[in-house]
Amino acid sequence: MRRWAYEFTVLPLLLLAGFAFSYRLLNIPSRMETTLFWIVFFLIPTLKYPKLGVYYLFCLPLFIPLFRRMYYLVSERPALDYLMLISDGVMAGLIMAIALLWIMNKERSGDVFSALITAYFLLLLVKVFAGSQVGVLEGLYGFKFNGLYVFFFFAGSYILTTFDETRKVLGWSSWMLLITALYGMKQILFGFAAFEQKWLDSITFTTLRIEGVVRPFSTYASPAALSDGMTILFLIGAYLMFSRGRNLFLFGALIAVAAVPPLLIATVRTNWMALLAGIFFYAVFLRLNHKWVKFGVVAAMVAGLAAYALKEDAPSEGSVTHTAVLAAQSGKNERGLTDVMIKNRTSALVNPLKEYSVQKRIDTWKGILITSWYFPLGKGQNTTGYAHSYYLQVLGEIGYPGLILFLSILAMGLYRGMKVIRHSRDKDLAEFARLLVTIIFVISILNLTGTHLHTPPGDVFFWFSLGCISRFYRRMQAERQATPAGRDGNPGSLPETANEGVSFPGRAFA
């Protein structure tokens, strides 16, 4: 019977698949065909091995925009590009895998953090169908950006189970981000490829150009996404330099240096300020041991920002971005590029409240706040347009309940992360927790003036970091309950140890 089934079912299917593959070698498949193939290609392994899906989602979203642009060599710009759905299909598979784990009672947890994440995800989904002022399809399109990757929290919280696995994912992501940094420098020094130029000619993406000059975007969807990636890459480099290991410092310094040129030339000044704040937060603030010192530092920072904002005697900014990008792409000397990008470009930061872009954002924020008075539960997914702030976009679309939920998630993540840093005996794990808390802190700053949880890599790293912190905290609590204190009175250490060294794809750093 098995032989009959093999001869009359399996062999014909293999022949048919071979014929289809041969046909497609000579005929370029459509976007929809390509999308379906790659979704199935990545989805099936993800359902069987959810951890593999985690690696996919630290890679695919970074390079799919580059792959999409290659199609412009053979076809016109489509009204709807199905290739955008490839990584979303993998995320959907990961959600199904998590649901199956819960159904089988293997990874179920009554953790409050997980409940908050689930409630936030469900609220985002409900606002697609209920209380929305747009159609379901348009609402689903908004949910794709706002809500789908929220569940990546559970990748860090439940799918990965050991500290060593988490560090391997970090190593994989650092290599992926380094590749995008190098490609960004290629665009700066040698310009854009033919397919990228065709893509640029077909779009009206206003923020991609400044005075008609295109900013580098590497493999990402936009210069802002490139800046997010380089900001995270720099922080990973700083973490590796602080970590123990004979080879980590050099590799950390390499990727930190590689992140700087694309970050500067992309000219997203919010990322510059957020990175500086993140460096101080990681290297100084999270290493202070006394609470009153931390409160004093925070108070001084708030006072400084208030004085900075109220200062009115500063000169206005001249437009220098055009010269900056031309200097980068025409290969001018380093001093000229530094003068343009660092000295002149930062002149606008002296009095940002008088900048046109800031005034426009303030007008948008006022409109959302006024609208929220009449729609306290939000107007539904994809109804606010670009709000220039993730927090106000949440307020405008899912209302005050959604904003309170998100702020609760953010506060709990930062609080639990600091508890892990303070109470962990494992210095390597404490250092890793500092990195995760810093990533959350930096992206939270960026979300004040942008929506950095709508596109990779910001959304992927943010929710994954929260998930890892949740897992570390749960294990710390379980260990403390099992062994409340050692001989010295200190809480029990986490069961996850970091004695094996940081492992990267293809090589282990002891």
List the predicted regions and their residue ranges.
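Alpha-helical transmembrane segments of multi-pass inner-membrane proteins
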Residues: 121-129, 167-199, 204-212, 218-288, ...
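Hydrophobic alpha-helical segments of polytopic membrane proteins
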Residues: 1-17, 36-44, 168-175, 234-318, ...
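Interfacial loop-to-transmembrane-helix boundary motif in multi-pass membrane proteins
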Residues: 51-54, 107-122, 147, 155-192
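TM-adjacent membrane-interface loops and short helices in multi-pass inner/ER membrane proteins
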Residues: 322-387, 391-394, 398-405
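Loop-to-helix entry and N-terminal half of a specific, functionally important transmembrane alpha helix
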Residues: 254-258, 417-449, 461
